[in-house]
């Protein structure tokens, strides 16, 4: 039987220990052993070697990036909490106490001192938590895991200890239960959808609340005119997104710092001048009295109180730009004292002027009072800084939404669209044109339709609290599976924060008909899109996997119908599969009976880690006899890595291919020994079995699928011990350079997916209508990869799933 075998570096069936030892001693740099074994480690600010000077600098920079949203909340919290006015003067003490302890419990205790430590090699957010869990337990739906992936820098992590049966039990349940996998996936896309809703509502409520202050100087302005001014600012905000923030980003921290100084100073002034006894709100007993006095009305008011913690998730999501210590310092030393003083001062002011609750912030600015309206010298500076702070808060939320969506693309949850990186200095600064247009349009429509911050706040709170709850549930899994904390601590975490968030959510849901329905509509649309796309993406992958062409049939495939011509140049065929020859290739050969002199099957694969070092980017394998010059390449990226431009990508790939050929020759002297130990290749092993309990491979099946029973050494052998074609290595490298000079052609499949004839109505709607609509209207295909049209060849193919 003439077929190719690949020999596993350790523990492969049919490989003698001597061969394994030989392979392990040779430090190869091809993708299947050497590159995977290298540990270069990405630089990150979270390292223990970071000095205090760097940490303090990062703490200052973090003020402008992650605190704009939560820092501008004083613009609208009291007006949202008391939409019908203040019923009792002591209600202010109870609400202030609620605000203070909400700030302490959720942002400070939960996020700053617990959640930040669950980062994924420095990156935070809902998607990072899901990726972290997926490295400990095989919960991802697409069966493209390879043993080499676990050897990439930043990937390998300590497995759960065998002494801790609970962690092993949780891991087993997650891997064997389809319901558990679906639940975690559902939580992830729910969190992503709510962040997108947050990114739509943050600009609307922040800009509208800041602009509303102009009516203090121009009381003749109508609310319609205020809305139109806000719409103009929003239009400019979304229009300049494509330029990024590289040129002006350095001003964010100073502007937000000035904002915090202003609101802290104004709050301190109001506290001293109006009523210093408001400090008794630090006694939580006033919360109990507030609910006793107001009952259901007090419970409903929690929907306004929770707006004081908007933007909290940003501390975690933007952690990749800073480190834990920097965020802890900036929160506890800058943010919390500033906003706490602001809320305390506003409460002291409202105790004296409760009728001004609808516009507390601007009317509490110190100055000479004339008919209880402020005309002091601080008004215009505060108004201008408030506008700038609102824009920065919106910009930070938009940047976070773009970054999260770019991560969702790597999970296969959205159509492939082009992600534009707007900064060469700061990673993670991305721009997605289609998403920017839809979010900008939605934000403007919301501003025009709702008109007031109170109405928008009803919708805003649902996005905020739902994201909190998603993080709480994922964090509980992290504590059980990865941190392996004591069960008492885990239960305490889940009960305290889960109960707090459920109470807030129940309050916000009471305002469902008053605007609360909006984020649910956003979430339903986005989740339907992501779930449908991911479902078809997985089913399509399985279809291709079930119809792979065995490597042993490559020779007969290339020689059918009188033979296939080898034309000059390099052909790169893109495929989702990481093993086997995709069904697209036979169709290409039959339609166009020619194959390029150097032919490479390319798979772009996203690993559940933030970054993959450039030296570890490519995995190569020889496909068939060496003389045919047919290769497989898996290009691996982290979920925050940017795809290179085509020319740069091709240059890196060719360099890696030549290195692979160079070091393949190092195995020639050991070929006979390994051949004697190797079994005949069994193509059936390359076809992974479906697990009866889930749509993901079992661990054994993944091993077989990803490597054809073998992985680490990537030695390509002839079954009969026949040595590879004798060709001088340097000559072969020159041949590759020559073919590259003759042109590189990119080949892609234009797949049309349809539901099978026996499919249910729901499946037909999802596949034939929703998926098809998304594919035709949103997918950019080769444009997302920036492939030039004059170098592209598309091959049509139909899949019936």
From Swiss-Prot:
GO biological process: potassium ion transport
Major localization listed first in the record, in broad terms: membrane
Keyword flag Cell membrane: yes
Taxonomy, superkingdom: Eukaryota
Listed GO MF terms: potassium ion transmembrane transporter activity
Subcellular location: Cell membrane
Disordered: region residues: 1-20, 679-728
Extracellular topological intervals: 81-94, 203-219, 269-298, 350-375, 451-461, 509-511
Residue stretches spanning the membrane: 58-80, 95-115, 182-202, 220-240, 248-268, 299-319, 329-349, 376-398, 430-450, 462-482, 488-508, 512-532
Pfam families: K_trans, K_trans_C
PANTHER family on file: OSMOTIC STRESS POTASSIUM TRANSPORTER, POTASSIUM TRANSPORTER 1
Protein name: Potassium transporter 1
């Amino acid at each position: 039987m003439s077929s190719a075998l690949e020999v596993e570096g350790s523990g492969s069936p049919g490989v003698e220990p001597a061969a394994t030892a030989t392979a392990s001693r040779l430090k190869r740099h091809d993708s299947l052993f050497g590159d995977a074994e290298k540990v270069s480690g990405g630089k990150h600010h979270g390292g223990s070697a970071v000095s205090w000077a760097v940490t303090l600098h990062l703490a200052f920079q973090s003020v402008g990036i992650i605190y704009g949203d939560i820092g501008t909340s004083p613009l609208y919290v009291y007006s949202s909490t008391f939409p019908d006015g203040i019923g009792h003067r002591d209600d202010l003490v109870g609400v202030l106490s609620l605000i203070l302890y909400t700030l302490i419990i959720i942002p400070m205790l939960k996020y700053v001192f617990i959640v930040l430590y669950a980062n994924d090699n420095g990156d935070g957010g809902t998607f990072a938590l899901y990726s972290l869990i997926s490295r400990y337990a095989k919960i991802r739906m697409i069966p493209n895991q390879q043993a080499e992936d676990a050897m990439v820098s930043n990937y390998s992590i300590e497995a759960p200890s065998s002494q801790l049966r609970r962690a092993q039990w949780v891991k087993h349940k997650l891997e064997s239960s389809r319901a558990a996998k679906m639940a975690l996936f559902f939580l992830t896309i729910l969190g992503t959808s709510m962040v997108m809703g947050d990114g739509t509502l943050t600009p609307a409520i922040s800009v509208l609340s800041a602009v509303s202050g102009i009516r203090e100087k121009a009381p003749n302005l109508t609310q319609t005119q205020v809305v139109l001014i806000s719409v103009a600012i929003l239009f400019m905000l979304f229009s300049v997104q494509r330029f990024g923030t590289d040129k002006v980003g350095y001003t964010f921290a100073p502007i937000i710092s000035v904002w915090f100084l202003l609101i802290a100073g104004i709050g301190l002034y109001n506290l001293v001048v109006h009523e210093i006894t408001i400090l008794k709100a630090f006694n939580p007993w006033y919360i109990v009295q507030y609910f006793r006095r107001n009952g259901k009305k007090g419970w409903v008011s929690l929907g306004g109180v929770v707006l004081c913690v908007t933007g909290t998730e940003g501390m975690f999501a933007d952690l990749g730009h800073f480190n834990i210590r920097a965020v802890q310092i900036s929160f506890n030393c800058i943010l919390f004292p500033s906003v706490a003083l602001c809320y305390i001062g506003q409460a002291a002011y409202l105790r004296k002027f409760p009728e001004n609750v609808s516009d507390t912030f601007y009317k509490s600015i110190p100055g000479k009072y004339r008919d209880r309206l402020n005309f002091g010298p601080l008004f215009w500076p505060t108004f201008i800084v408030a506008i700038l702070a609102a824009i920065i808060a919106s910009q930070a939320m938009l940047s976070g939404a773009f970054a999260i969506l770019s991560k969702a693309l790597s999970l296969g949850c959205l159509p492939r669209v082009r992600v534009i990186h707007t900064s060469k200095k700061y990673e993670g600064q991305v721009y997605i044109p289609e998403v920017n247009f839809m979010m900008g349009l939605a934000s403007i429509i919301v501003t025009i339709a709702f008109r007031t911050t109170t109405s928008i706040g009803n919708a805003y709170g649902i996005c905020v609290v739902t994201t909190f709850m998603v993080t709480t549930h994922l964090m509980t899994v992290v504590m059980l599976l990865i941190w392996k904390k004591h069960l008492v601590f885990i239960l305490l975490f889940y009960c305290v924060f889960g109960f707090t968030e459920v109470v807030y959510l129940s309050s916000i849901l009471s305002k469902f008909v008053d605007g609360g329905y909006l984020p649910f509509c956003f979430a339903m649309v986005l989740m339907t899109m992501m779930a449908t796309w991911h479902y078809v993406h997985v089913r399509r992958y399985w279809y291709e996997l079930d119809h792979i062409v065995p490597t042993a049939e490559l020779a007969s495939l290339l020689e059918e119908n009188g033979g296939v011509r080898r034309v000059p140049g390099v052909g790169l065929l893109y495929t989702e599969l990481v093993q086997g020859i995709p069904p697209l290739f036979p169709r290409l050969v039959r339609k166009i009976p020619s194959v390029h002199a150097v032919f490479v099957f390319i798979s772009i694969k996203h690993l559940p880690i933030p970054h993959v070092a450039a030296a570890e980017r490519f995995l190569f394998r020889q496909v068939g006899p060496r003389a045919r010059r047919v290769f497989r390449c898996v290009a691996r990226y982290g979920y925050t890595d940017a795809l290179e431009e085509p020319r740069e990508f091709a240059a890196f790939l060719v360099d890696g291919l030549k290195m692979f050929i160079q070091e393949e020759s190092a195995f020639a002297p050991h070929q006979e020994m390994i051949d004697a130990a190797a079994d005949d290749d069994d193509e059936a092993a390359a076809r992974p079995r479906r697990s009866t309990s889930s749509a993901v491979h079992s661990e054994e099946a993944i091993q077989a699928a990803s490597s054809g029973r073998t992985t680490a050494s990537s030695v390509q052998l002839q079954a009969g011990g026949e040595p590879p074609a004798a060709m001088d290595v340097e000559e072969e490298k020159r041949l590759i350079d020559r073919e590259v000079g003759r042109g590189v052609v990119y080949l892609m499949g234009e797949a049309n997916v349809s539901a099978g004839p026996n499919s249910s109505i729901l499946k037909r709607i999802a596949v034939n209508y929703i998926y098809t609509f998304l594919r035709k209207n949103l997918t950019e295909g080769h444009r997302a990869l920036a492939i030039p049209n004059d170098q592209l060849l598309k091959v049509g193919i139909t899949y019936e799933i």
